[in-house]
Amino acid sequence: MSTAPAAFDIKTFLATLTGAPGVYKMLDRNGEVIYVGKAKNLKKRVASHFAQRGSSPKQNAMVARVQAIEVTVTRTEGEALLLENQLIKRHKPRYNINLRDDKSYPYIYVSTHQEFPRLAFHRGSRARPGRFFGPFPSAAAVRDSLKTLQKIFPVRQCEDSYFVNRTRPCLQYQIERCTGPCVGLVGAETYGEDVTNTLLFLEGRGEALIDRLAQRMEQAAQRLEFEKAARYRDQISNLRTVLAKQLVAGEQGDLDMIACAIKGNIACVHVVFVRNGQQIGDRSFFPRMQDEHDAAAVLGAFIPQFYLDKEIPRELLLSHEIRELELFESVLGQQAGRPVKISWRLRGERAKRLELARANAECALTTRLASQQTIADRLRHLTEMLGLAEPPKRMECFDISHTQGDQTVASCVVFDRTGPLKSAYRRFNIEGITGGDDYAAMAQALSRRYQRIRAGEVEAPDILFIDGGKGQIHAAARTLAELGVENIRIIGIAKGPDRKPGMETLFQTGCSDPIVVKPDNPGSLLIQHIRDEAHRFAITGHRQRRAKTVTRSPLQAIAGLGPKRRQRLLRQFGGLRQISRADVEALSSVEGINRQLAQRIYDLFHDHGA
């Protein structure tokens, strides 16, 4: 007979707790971290949680679940803030305010270390050589900027593998979006001028760039190079148009305007990004929180989670005052390596712009509430349709995508009671199976995913949706049984007649009778949403994987054959087909290619039956 665990003895714990600064983790009976906090004085802060009984039902519920508290002492309160941020991101405690969307933000990348640098979209680590500009609020903002830059300064944006294998200029050259460095139509010095101008633009030195171009235009005109002068004139005109559209009145540097709106226990934080005096976009965030909090608490949780692992602007303008403002300025300044100012009492144009940001936060929150009401209604109907005792807290859906069995990718999308959890989405590149065997592909993806769930690294879903019929769910059930994973309802979504949405049939493990979905049932729309999202995510991953294979040249697999030698080969022979037909003697006649390297090139193509 099991007995309930003894209540946590807070008095005994506090008797030995230090008054130093640090971080504390509250754990429940299962050892799960349910709350992380920081403190200037650990003893006083931890004691305050237990002295606040009756302050709110959620506070009481949290304290009642505490079975242990772990403490880490730090030297300063600033160190405690940094550690608290890391622990919240790692554990995502139920009772903390959590920033849901934590994926890395996109940048513009310039490969300045190359002879002919390229401009590119970049997301992820910034460890490789070159320069990064950002972060941008969205991928669309980066692509819009790249498109604008390419119209003004024709710097290449193609992949290096594509660049080194060209034998003739591509379409970008024909439409005057590139100057053709891949085939020697422009020298490094002339090309470098466009790169320098691009960097000046990205650094926000627009007026200096216009002055530079105006000087070049006058010099070209004096030399009677009227075509070149006209090109500079057009660049200046285009630049003035772009700068006039983007300039934020009265602003010169980097700043973010951050506004918060709250209704009940749902909050929206709207951020307007200004870089080098130019507004580059805005974005709304919806932190997850279990209890009602004021704007000061929401912003105080948002700022460290959002900024401590990103490039920090020089100034943050807030819609509300936050607690410990000086501490935040100090820690952010240390991270940035320069002063960071946080302001909330604003006047004039800044106050008007922040009020607009607040209006956007209110609007986004209203839309979110309406959307959540729709999702809640659909979830209620789904619960009734499946005969569940309560709405599922978490659902996963898997799908498979490939082209005639090649480059197979499986997707896993995750939904909770508020909708899609995009930060929890995962893709799996499937290897070592017979091409086109969807059962084997699904088994491999499920095995890789649910091994982590069994190990407690990932939260288990209540429902596992599979895009398929009886065969797929039986295969899925076997995989989970082999892993020892239980208590997950597996449902197959079989397409209806003519694959029409809303005409699906659901198959469940342990149930012989299928469920025929009615098109007008709101639960049907939720199932379609989940399945379509899994399909979209799978096919996007498959296309990306296939594109990498298509753009990679077989010459790149040869050791000792670098980009310049590959380019010489292609120029001399005209293409891969001609290279594959050449003998060792002809290959070794190319500058920089000795007989041993020529033999390896010959063997590569002949081993492939070329």
UniProtKB/Swiss-Prot annotation:
The keyword Hydrolase does not apply. Gene3D superfamilies: 5' to 3' exonuclease, C-terminal subdomain (1.10.150.20), GIY-YIG endonuclease (3.40.1440.10), UVR domain (4.10.860.10), UvrC, RNAse H endonuclease domain (3.30.420.340). GO terms for cellular component: cytoplasm; excinuclease repair complex. One of its GO terms (molecular function) is DNA binding. The keyword Magnesium does not apply. Its main location: cytoplasm. Keywords: Cytoplasm, DNA damage, DNA excision, DNA repair, Excision nuclease, SOS response. Residues 207-242 form the UVR domain. InterPro entries: GIY-YIG_endonuc, GIY-YIG_endonuc_sf, GIY-YIG_UvrC_Cho, RuvA_2-like, UVR_dom, UVR_dom_sf, UvrABC_protein_C, UvrC. GO terms for biological process: nucleotide-excision repair; SOS response. Residues 19-97 form the GIY-YIG domain. It is found in: Cytoplasm. Belongs to the UvrC family. Interacts with UvrB in an incision complex. The UvrABC repair system catalyzes the recognition and processing of DNA lesions. UvrC both incises the 5' and 3' sides of the lesion. The N-terminal half is responsible for the 3' incision and the C-terminal half is responsible for the 5' incision. This is UvrABC system protein C.
